[in-house]
């Protein structure tokens, strides 16, 4: 892969995935020799990269044009725009195995909730009702720029609003399998030390 890969420079995500690549749990303390394992992986990934950018459109374009064969890291949220435009050869892939209970990916689920403020507004609950309506749920899933599954798709009234191309764009066919191979997002315990190492290797 040397010279045939890219790094999508979403640094916080890359720190987690580089830890997993180094056979480490990103959500447990990483110290001493394990930090050197992390450094070695960061050095290898950055050293072999042809392209570094924080522009997912540029990265997908390089993939489609054959300039690179893969990029580190991404997911449904980065692959879906290209897939929806017809480039279905672009696909987010979760490792088959990994160092934490056999899992090698990370997933996060965003929730909208009402916060228990001392002086709550009734508008919060109105908003929750609004965003869970089928048409708004669909609009949230396909907000321009990146497309993602939403939990409301468990409701048949929401799911029925998606056509086959939209479901294919967000890789609905493999969602359950990808989720089963992924850790839930947590706080990266040693983030300060790891981002420092990451930044050093990115600049070298």
Each predicted region: which residue ranges?
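Ligand-binding pocket segment of bilobal, Venus flytrap-like solute-binding proteins
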Residues: 7-10, 14-18, 26-94
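Short beta-strand->loop
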Residues: 88-106, 115-117
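Residue-level recognition of the GNAT/N-acetyltransferase active site
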Residues: 8, 21, 115
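Short helix-loop capping/hinge motifs at secondary-structure junctions, enriched
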Residues: 23-30, 118-124
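A conserved helix-loop-strand patch within extracytoplasmic ligand-binding domains
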Residues: 1-7
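Conserved C-terminal helix/tail region of periplasmic/extracytoplasmic solute-binding proteins
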Residues: 167-204
